[in-house]
Amino acid sequence: MGSMLKNFVALAATLVVIMGLFCIGPSVHAQEAAVTVQISVKDHRFQPAEIRAAANKPIILRIKNLDATPMEFESVTLRVEKVVVGNSEGIIRLRALSPGHYDFFDDFHPESRGKLIVE
């Protein structure tokens, strides 16, 4: 009976490892496929005001706020908003997007506008 228990434990451990690989595999792959785009905010203006990214790939926006005051990255078309405090960086993860133009702005300074062009 001892050997049956050992075989059962070995089989159970193997199944746990295999199931773990299935759970981790897709998320690691999705992170590898993501495209990172960097943008800065200085004097309440996006720099650059127009950014580009590849279509049909997840996008990571790295927003560096160089101002001392907070800003709020917002986009109605992307359905995101993110407050980035002064002198810090924020990250926004976007799903894979279809080709097109996606407007964004600083909700605290609405005159500050930009555009994400996905090609």
Regions found by a protein language model. Give the residues of each.
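Structural beta-strand segments of beta-rich domains
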Residues: 49, 57-61
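Short beta-strand/loop motifs in extracellular/secreted proteins, especially
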Residues: 59, 69-71, 114
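Extracellular/periplasmic metallocenter environments
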Residues: 29-38, 45, 84-119
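Bacterial N-terminal signal peptides that target proteins for export
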Residues: 2-15
